[in-house]
Amino acid sequence: MLSKYQPSAHIAVTRAHWEDLHQAISSGKVTIDGNSLTLADVVAVSKFGCYARLSENRETIDAINESVSTLQECLDEGHHIYGVNTGFGGSADSRTDHLASLQRALLQLLQSGILTKADIGSGDTPSQSHAMPPEWVKAIMVVRSNSVARGHSAVSIGSIEAILRLLQRDITPVVPLRGTISASGDLMPLAYIVGAIEGNPGVFARAGKSPHGQALPAQQVLEQLGIPRITLGPKEALGLVNGTAASAALSSLVLYEAHRLALLSQVTTALTVEALRGSAESFHPFISQARPHDGQMEAASNILTVMRGSRLAMGTSEVQTGLVQDRYSLRTASQWIGPQLEDLLLADRQITVELNSTTDNPLIDSVSRHFYCGGNFQATSVTSAMEKTRLALQMLGKLMFAQCSEMIDPSLNNGLPTNLVADDPSLSFTMKGVDISMAAYMSELAYLANPVSSHVQTAEMHNQAVNSLAFVSARYTMQAVDIVSMMSACSLYVACQALDLRVLQLNFFRELHPIVCNGTHDAFHTILAPKELERITQQLVTAIQDAWLTTSRMDAGDRCQRVIKLSLPILLNEMRGAIPSDRQQVDLLTSIGNWEEATCYKMLEAYKQTHERFCRTQNTVEYLGAGSKAIYHAIRHKVGVPFHQGFVEQPSADDLDTTAIINGREKKTTGGWISLIYEALRDDSLTGVILEAVQPVRSI
């Protein structure tokens, strides 16, 4: 089955998943029929508690029942069927008539994972859990139920409904985190889920929402809740454990978040372009049309959409000083992001197909009444999807790291304060720690990007000489999702601060012209003609603004003095050409000295007043592109992360009631604010805003 979202742009796929998720959440249920399970359905059941139920469609029910009856007919005719009356794997040369015991023997060999007392809640909290998170287990349960509902596995309706009943009653088996090589599927994790539905007292489960509460033996949990135990039929243990459900389920959770992070990387790129007053020209359609890769064209278009109407990003016709073109982290962002979008789309197709596939062995064709021994359990397609996704995340993280560093570094950020401090940099280092954290995140992310598939080891009597390691790859890719989410939170925090400081700077520049104009008039109106005063004033304003951009490492008072001194050559040069000879007796040095002192004082006062007003009320949104405005507003108001005012923000045990708050809000550490953004990203509450910023619904 091909994904219903293909072919399409990446943002269309991301939006479709998000809309499907919220539709499922709104309806409160997901129907399992073996053919239509989506990434969004898996997320809805595992993360949002949607009710999963087996379809009552006649075709689905008949296919399941026919596979069971076909198996029984073949057994009655004396056929030898792999895993039903033979041994398993490299031991398939053995035969037995003890069919029920054989299925129990399979579970015995597979329930070999490590779980400590702490993992089941009867010991001290472990420093590192050996059990899967509950949402992973729930995802596995819904994916496996969907796969065997296709009617190729001889798994009965009763067994499928037993798994779904655990989900419906919010019962989560405790499943070991490690131990599967995703060769004959994810045998070991699935064996613990099967153990739970048969009431194995050696398998543990939790009822309710607490992931760290004490788990009880599955037998006890089922008895307490009045849930009947399942007695497995001739192929049911094999049919339930022999499949790629664990890998496909975790990959679904990974991809849902990876799509969002890829979209967010385009948003943070646009925010960075605006904050650094970069050029929108880098994303002009002509450039993409000259090299028409689908991903590049989409990324460039999306970035431009976010910046539409921006008063900060430079257009193609504007006169620019400094670099004539942006550095690579901005100028080539669409070329960098584009291939990652293409890879994620392919990964999405692979996982969507896997969700709606039969992945056990042997497979039953109820029409021909034939059993086929094959290898659909080899989860290499899932590995392929996860390796691509993890590398894409590394590439996106690297771009965010480069852009973030550029915004923080005063040598690269086009005149923003060093470390993006809002106060004096001699005693405030706002984003320096964030810069260091980003380097730490990036280093770990780069390590995780290494392939897992190249580390395959031979297993199980050389029968499993090649194995996919799909679940291991998915685990590491989920770690990459976590790290890139942290980096994204940092990037959003840094970008919003940089945008605020840029607008604060522009507010201050607006105050400069009257200060310089009045100061020049007061000092030199008896010496220069009005037209000469106007010309010199404009040149001084330009020189002062340029000097302001190059002195961002200095405290405000020293900075104003330095800026004025740097502008003096302009004044002296213009004076020399403008003063007639009969005025040479005038004490120009005194006039210039008075101008220097007065202008410096008024400039500093204007900066302090502008800064004070801005700390109370930010007018940043007036300058932002429409998409950037939506993101900025979400961070500042929906998430509640404010403009960082500097050293005064640091919480202290010595704070009085009056100093423990700023502008009516509490103080937090820098990491405390970033953590709020991180949580909003992970709980999906910002996805709608991100989608709207990149592709407003009205424009679809």
UniProtKB/Swiss-Prot annotation:
Cross-referenced Pfam families: Lyase_aromatic
Pathway annotation from the record: Secondary metabolite biosynthesis
Catalysed reaction, written as an equation: L-phenylalanine = (E)-cinnamate + NH4(+)
CDD domains: PAL-HAL (cd00332)
Name of the featured protein: Phenylalanine ammonia-lyase hkm12
Record note on biotechnological use: Hancockiamide D displays potent cytotoxic activity against murine myeloma NS-1 cells, suggesting a potential antitumour application. More interestingly, hancockiamide C, the likely end metabolite of the hkm pathway, shows potent Arabidopsis thaliana seed anti-germination activity, but is inactive against the monocot Eragrostis tef seed, suggesting that it could be a herbicidal lead targeting monocots. The herbicidal activity of hancockiamide C could be due to its phenylpropanoid-like structural features, which may act on the plant lignan pathways, and hence warrants further investigations.
Keyword vocabulary terms for this entry: Lyase, Phenylalanine catabolism
Single GO term (MF): phenylalanine ammonia-lyase activity
Residues noted as binding (E)-cinnamate in the record, renumbered to the chain: 242, 325, 331, 361, 432, 460, 463
